Amino acid sequence: MATPHINAEMGDFADVVLMPGDPLRAKHIAETFLEDVREVNNVRGMLGFTGTYKGRKISVMGHGMGIPSCSIYTKELITDFGVKKIIRVGSCGAVRNDVKLRDVVIGMGACTDSKVNRIRFKDHDFAAIADFDMVRNAVDAAKALGVDARVGNLFSADLFYSPDGEMFDVMEKYGILGVEMEAAGIYGVAAEFGAKALTICTVSDHIRTHEQTTAAERQTTFNDMIKIALESVLLGDKA
């Protein structure tokens, strides 16, 4: 049954959904990597599609920007459409000099300055981590594809234009591989509602060197990340 934000029916979504922030990137992923694709959501322009990858039913849908937006979509997918696994495929900014533009980062955990997980966890600190098997499958998929993916912590920020530049020094000291805006929230939603989640990011810009990719490149050229996500789903089916 349709929700306020998703005009689909039970069965329209696969049990695994890849979720970029940008709905146009969702469309690109569906058209480029999936077969027998059909649109299953278009409410508020947040496009969702279901198709098959090597015969395996998979869905892809945008989640918007920031923890509030992605939390709405992931919660509804899990509780109203039977989705079991969420794989965020997005972009992040690097703060360490050994992390380069277009590197793939597998988010084993996610720190955050958001308070949403404290709200849901009764004002205690919640360890926002990915599902271990999904991390392992993504690492194995990356190795099989010849991609040298980085594995470690992300930082999910509430502010894109942060006034606190010194925080980047702290992130670097603590080994944060990338800064984005959603992973900690998605991991919290998955934990609350009994699902599994993983975030895979491609470095789209470097906060130290000011290198950056264009909007068009972010939409269409981060194919290694998508291939890792899709192949990891197939590996999970074999487990």
From Swiss-Prot:
Phosphate binds at residues 21, 25, 44, 88-91. Coiled coil: none annotated. It is an enzyme of class 2 (transferase). A purine D-ribonucleoside binds at residues 5, 180-182, 204-205. PANTHER family: PURINE NUCLEOSIDE PHOSPHORYLASE DEOD-TYPE (PTHR43691:SF2), URIDINE PHOSPHORYLASE (PTHR43691). NCBIfam families: deoD, PRK05819.1, PRK13374.1. Belongs to the PNP/UDP phosphorylase family. This is Purine nucleoside phosphorylase DeoD-type. It comes from Citrobacter koseri (strain ATCC BAA-895 / CDC 4225-83 / SGSC4696).
